[in-house]
Amino acid sequence: MKTIYIYCEGPTEESFINTVLYPYFFALGIYVRPIVCETRRDANRKYRGGVSRYAKIKSELMILCKSHPHEYVTTMFDYYAMPSDTPGIADATTDIFERINKIESIINEDIGERNCKFHFMLYEFEGILFSKPETFSLIAGDEVVTAVQRIREEFETSEHINNSPETAPSKRLEALIPGYAKIKNGTQLSDAMGIHTIMKQCPHFKRWIQDMAAW
């Protein structure tokens, strides 16, 4: 089996990879392994999750690529709130898919490793959870399901749900569901709706999955 290392932002993405992506790719003869970003290291402890500087991401990705030259490396980082030193991040192309493809290409060129393909989640991981609003009945009442459905209907796709500090997908869910647990609930919801539903509703995510399957 070939291996794809997915360098990801934190434990929420790690749980999603292990629970949702792993069985899908295992059936295709591909082993996906999450590697969580380390924000810093002390003598006796590692701190995982979050993104502070692009330079740190680049350095870790290059090490990962060179350590596994015959395997593939990709990423799972939220486009929302990426560091300002990220190459191409200031691009203002109106179409979000065109913009994100351009930025990913610029980053891939900057990293310069043939076995690396950078991938952003639009606008963040929680965006994919709007792919099937009725799934929220697993963790909340009908009023929340209706509210999630209304939000989804405002946008062309789940990946268009925007990225301001007040209206990013995670902020919307936290406002709707007191005590919303990102790791537990995010994994539960995405697993229940299934990868095929997510791919149908999220074109950029779908292309990423297809690219990995074709490597």
Regions found by a protein language model. Give the residues of each.
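Extreme N-terminal starter segment of soluble prokaryotic enzymes
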Residues: M1-I4
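Short hydrophobic beta-strand that contains or immediately precedes a catalytic carboxylate
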Residues: I6-C8
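Long alpha-helical, hydrophobic tracts
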Residues: G10-T12
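Non-catalytic terminal and connector segments of soluble metabolic enzymes
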Residues: R48-Y54
